Structure formats: C-alpha cells, structure tokens
C-alpha cells in the first residue's frame, strides 16, 4: 500500500521542487521537505580559477550546487549532498532533488487551550486562550528576502547586510570577483551567501524556524 504522501503547500508557483511537505504512514503529518543548507562557497572550495574564461573549477569532492545556486563560484549558496556518490556519473557530486530530506516538523509536541466566562451586573465577558509548544514553521519571508527571486532587490537587512553577506564589489564599487586573493581577503568575515546566487524560491533548512 501507499506509505508516503507527497504534498505541496503551493505558497508560490515557481518554487524549485514544489512538493515541499511529506506525510508517512505511522508517522506525523506536516513534515517540511527540502534541501539542507551548507553555507556558501569560499575561494578555498576551488582548485583553480581561469582568468581568461573567468571560470572556477571545484575541488574534487566538493558538492556542485548549480541546480539551485547557479554555476559554482565563491559566495554562491551551497547545499549538502545526502545521497551516495555515484562513481559512474559524469558529475558525481552534483546536487539532485533526491538530496532533499525532512528539514522540519510543523506538528507541535503538545497544544491546548482554556476559556474563561464572567458576568457582573449585567455585563458578561468571554475569553479563550490556546497554545502550541515546540513546532517548526517554514518562514517563506526568509526565502524571498535572501534570494534573487523576482529580481526585486529585496534585502533582509539583518542577515544579508553589507557587513555580513558575501560581496563581489568592494566599498568603492570596484569589481573583485575575478581576483581570488582580493576576493578571499575582502570576504573573510562573511557569514551569508550572496543573494544573487539563488534565482528561484527554494524550500531549504535555513528558512525553518
């Protein structure tokens, strides 16, 4: 019989691999299904840089996240490959949709509620309170405001402020993406990928809270 239900939240019609929820027989419902973030590429992830063609070559064993974050280069978002590497594949370390997994659970560990009713000199009042504890949500705002989806130059200030995100231009506006040493030094304290590397919404662990 059927053991897995593949579900789609349909919060947008252009989400990469839009089937973003799962339910399993004998398990809980509301499981968030997507990719696991692994930070971003740094200059150290690459074997070489060809200054003529301006292309980067990944080191052996480094995951190729190009299906999600464009051609690999420093600053682009990186994701974890969870499936076994196929040595017979032409690109054994490339990410595929099979590398998705359960990244969150929207079902609370427990929930409850209570109500109060009161009357006094002809006045009455009713109140009801409910609560849920220990559950995950997929924050779609984090997805849209840290990517280049729609090319609207959205900016999630706290996470991708200029002092946190990977930058390809210095403070004077000079392009540094093709100068490996300068690029690495300038971004040595970066904590976030360059948002222009992701062109479509992705269900990813970064957005699960």
Task: Label each region the model flagged.
Residues 1-209:
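Outer/extracellular conduits and scaffolds centered on Gram-negative outer-membrane beta-barrels
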